[in-house]
């Protein structure tokens, strides 16, 4: 609707829910092949098709604020990397879309790093799943539409999903009575900035006049922040409703738990970065940003494995 209004009807978009044309995990190939024009989804879903997607949305213990990601995309070369990544698959990357941090909904209490071991938990795959597997979790990859029934039937013990407002409306508090979060310093361990994006088939993109291409990119940027702030407001009420209306307990891990998870991160960052040259380019760019005075999360001495041995890029 926003695009239609902004273009005075010269460019209109007809949207379909996931599964209406193809399944969630088939969208990438369908748009690449021109089965339909575009999709709106999470970049983290496509790491198996394009390893650089690992670094197009947040991953454990890296950039963890929306403004940091926006800066990387718009000022530090991230947009060009994303467009090259999707361009290799006949798609044009319109821009990042801010969403929310992700929660873990659990049927059982998980109060420490040690209590994750042996649990069967849905994660989106890639580097995120790898870090939890290193901690002893049995990870499961499921499309979003299959998460609720899997939790309800006890097929999995817990699941990552999106933020509080969306999850409350989906009824997660009716079947999983625990929300697992990090401490205030690290509210979300695995996807603190769960970015989405819009990809359009390259042939479809080239048919759009230049001024409408620019309008479409501007509309995506506007939608990104409108969506983000609306979700943050809705989350405030949702957390209250989870606890007061559905009897959900919010468990916060300790900083000491975070440090135990964190030791798995650097070697896995580098393993995923080395899967292809573009992934490495993205990670190197973010690693330099992470070491700046402005961010200051790491120094070069922190790029070591669990035994303290230096890792080379």
Give the positions of each predicted feature:
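N-terminal secretory/targeting leader peptides
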Residues: 1-69, 77-313
